[in-house]
């Protein structure tokens, strides 16, 4: 049997709430809100009390538009309830009181910005003393965004990884509609094999083969320039001796590498050509493919090999300088190793993040080089100096570069007193100029590296957190399905229903309707004595969580 006293108390609370609501509406609606009226704000279970005039200091915000007609207002407790972060709200409320917004040190940056956005405030209103913390939070978010792009192809969840792949290839709509052809299955698989080294064991094997060919190509390119691995090029010619006698002779003009190096280059470039064609055919976007610097390096290096081979075979007296320059491009294939090592990727992202500091460093170096080159040129001419090596300012530029970078080859040195003074100042200024931006670059690298190390140690999969709106919608649907089944199966059919306690979150209005229906069912059970043997007894426990949510645990015992 249901407890009638609990329902009587519930009805009395509802009637008192109606009386308070009518009295509150008369007070706030007819007479207006008094600026000296105190307002109670319950934020995350922590009650804050302030004046209405305090909340009106910052217009066009959530707190400046509080009225008793809002769903957040609880007429029983005469307070506004917000399920938000209470510690952050203390700083926000203090902003209304003092007009100064300070950044809390014990709260994460994105959380603080999210709370400010909810209350209708802007993070730019933060006091200057807290700007460093705000900028540090933004830098952290940018770093994590870069690492997210690096790990975009390493999603552990197969379903999410498949969805990301379909989105990358532009087949998202066909994927959700269930339209998948063989080409749509083959193309991402082949692309993953040759472009994502850590996607599978086969991809790791292909990546290992590619790295092996890169090292073999670079190693042979370096070795073939050594004299021990080169053959002399001999040219036979006839020399006319005095007296008209023609004598044949052999002249050593130059050297060429051993034939084995040509075979090694051919084998390596066959692999590079095959890899380049496959990656081009199966790439998600041809435009992005050509925009990639690594792809352009691979394309130019591969084409340079075939250009060298054609020039050697077609042109009899091939231009050696042009051929050697084209072959030098192949050494840039070392940059392809960045695809296979995260440390190199972090280094590249560090240089990108430090681009402003690097540009500033180059600018100051150029400025100092020009100034000290001109100074040392005129300083060496002020005194008699027969060993003057600074015959022009352009020659002084080379000396200034070597001095400011603390290299000091020693091929050019000042010999006069003023020249040595200029050289000393040049060396000191070079040390200061180079040393100042270095900590910023090191800090960026340490930030990228530490975040990447922490990301590798953290679990990839996290617990899924549902939004509150989705939970409330599911609760309403569950309550709508549960009520007819309980009334039909328990009262009408006479069948015993056994259920476990099911705590659900529903809206306050749904709670009122549910209790009202139970109350009517109790009256029908008391009036009908013939159905006691087949009826069920329901006990409902109502636990108040807030003004807009109530947890109901329903237990039906046979």
UniProtKB/Swiss-Prot annotation:
Q: Describe its membrane topology.
A: Multi-pass membrane protein
Positions of region (Disordered): 516-546
Indicate yes or no for the key word ATP-binding: no
- The superkingdom listed in its UniProt entry is Eukaryota
Identify the tissues in which this protein is expressed: Expressed in muscles for egg-laying, anal depressor and sphincter, and the four most anterior head muscles. Found in neurons including enteric motor neurons AVL and DVB and the sensory neuron PHB, the spermatheca, and the distal tip cells of the somatic gonad.
Q: Which GO terms describe its biological process?
A: action potential; monoatomic ion transmembrane transport; potassium ion transmembrane transport; protein homooligomerization
Q: Does the keyword Nucleus apply?
A: no
Q: What is its main location?
A: membrane
Supply the name of the protein: Potassium voltage-gated channel protein egl-36
Q: Which gene encodes it?
A: egl-36
């Amino acid at each position: 049997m249901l407890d009638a006293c609990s329902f009587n108390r519930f009805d009395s609370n509802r009637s008192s709430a109606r009386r308070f609501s009518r009295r509150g509406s008369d007070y706030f609606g007819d007479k207006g809100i008094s600026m000296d009226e105190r307002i109670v704000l319950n934020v995350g279970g922590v009650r804050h009390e302030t004046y209405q005039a305090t909340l009106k200091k910052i217009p066009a915000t959530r707190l400046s538009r509080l009225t008793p007609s809002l769903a957040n207002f609880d007429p029983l407790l005469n307070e506004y309830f917000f399920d938000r972060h209470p510690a952050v709200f203390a700083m926000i409320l203090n902003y209304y009181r003092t007009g100064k917004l300070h950044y809390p040190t014990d709260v994460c940056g994105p959380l603080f910005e999210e709370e400010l956005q909810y209350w209708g405030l802007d993070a730019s209103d933060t006091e200057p003393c807290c700007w460093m913390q705000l900028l540090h939070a933004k830098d952290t978010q940018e770093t994590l965004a870069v690492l997210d792009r690096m790990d975009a192809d390493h999603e552990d969840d197969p379903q999410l990884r498949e969805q990301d792949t379909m989105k990358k290839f532009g087949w998202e709509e066909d994927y959700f509609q269930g339209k998948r052809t063989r080409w749509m299955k083959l193309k991402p698989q082949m692309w993953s094999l040759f472009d994502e080294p850590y996607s599978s064991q086969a991809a790791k094997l292909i990546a290992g083969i590619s790295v092996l060919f890169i090292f073999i190509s670079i190693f042979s390119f370096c070795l073939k320039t050594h004299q021990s691995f080169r053959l002399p090029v001999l040219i036979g010619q006839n020399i006319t001796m005095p007296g008209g006698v023609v004598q044949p002779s052999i002249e050593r003009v130059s050297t060429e590498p051993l034939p084995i190096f040509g075979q090694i280059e051919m084998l390596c470039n066959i692999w590079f050509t095959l890899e380049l064609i496959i990656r081009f055919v199966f790439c998600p976007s041809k435009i992005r493919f050509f925009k990639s610097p690594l792809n352009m390096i691979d394309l130019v290096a591969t084409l340079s090999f075939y250009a060298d081979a054609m020039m050697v075979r077609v042109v009899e007296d091939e231009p050696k300088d042009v051929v050697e320059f084209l072959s030098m491009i192949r050494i840039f294939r070392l940059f392809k190793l960045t695809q296979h090592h995260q440390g190199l990727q972090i280094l590249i992202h560090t240089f990108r993040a430090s681009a402003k500091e690097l540009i500033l460093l180059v600018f100051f170096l150029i400025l100092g080089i020009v100034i000290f080159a001109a100074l040392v040129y005129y300083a060496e001419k002020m005194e008699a100096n027969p060993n003057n090596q600074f015959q022009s300012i352009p020659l002084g530029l080379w000396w200034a570069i070597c001095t400011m970078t603390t290299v000091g080859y020693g091929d050019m040195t000042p010999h006069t007193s003023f020249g040595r003074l200029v050289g000393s100042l040049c060396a000191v200024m070079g040390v200061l100029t180079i040393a100042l931006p270095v900590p910023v670059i090191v800090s960026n690298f340490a930030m990228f590296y530490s975040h990447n190390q922490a990301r590798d140690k953290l679990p990839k999969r996290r617990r899924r957190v549902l939004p509150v709106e989705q939970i409330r919608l599911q609760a309403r649907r569950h309550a709508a399905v549960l009520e007819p089944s309980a009334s039909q199966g328990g009262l009408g059919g006479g069948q015993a229903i056994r259920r476990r306690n099911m705590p659900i979150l529903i809206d306050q209005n749904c709670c009122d309707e549910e209790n009202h229906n139970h109350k009517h069912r109790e009256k029908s059970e008391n009036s009908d004595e013939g159905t006691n043997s087949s009826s069920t007894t329901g006990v409902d426990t109502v636990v108040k969580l807030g003004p807009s949510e109530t947890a109901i645990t329903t237990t039906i015992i046979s």
